[in-house]
Amino acid sequence: MTKDAYIEFCKNLVGADTDQPFNEDFESTVARHFDTKKWFALVMEYQGKTVVNLKCDPMESDFLRSVFKGVIPAYHMNKVHWNTVFLESDVPDKEIERMTLTSFELTDKKKRMPKKSSKKSPKNPL
């Protein structure tokens, strides 16, 4: 998948937007949720190749890294929850799209479970 095709795929997701937030860096593109501005993909150059960082379930991350040479622990992000995917590699376009949709869902604030309150409730409030 080419960089332009990938960015177009991200732009076409309902509720997604893309931008280039880094000063003087016009090569990197962030795909984010329109309402929360939370990232779900970071497209950039790494080792002379175009890559995308995507959020992933930790168990699936390990599996994908073992199956595809083009999937490695994320560059410059949490390596447990994020993978770096080489766009023009052994990873099929449909798999890159699936991983992107997963990242989109995992970073969607509306889908996340509420955090447990750290405050203790009284045993007998009455």
Which residue ranges define each predicted feature?
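Charge-dense, helix-prone N-terminal extensions
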Residues: 1-126
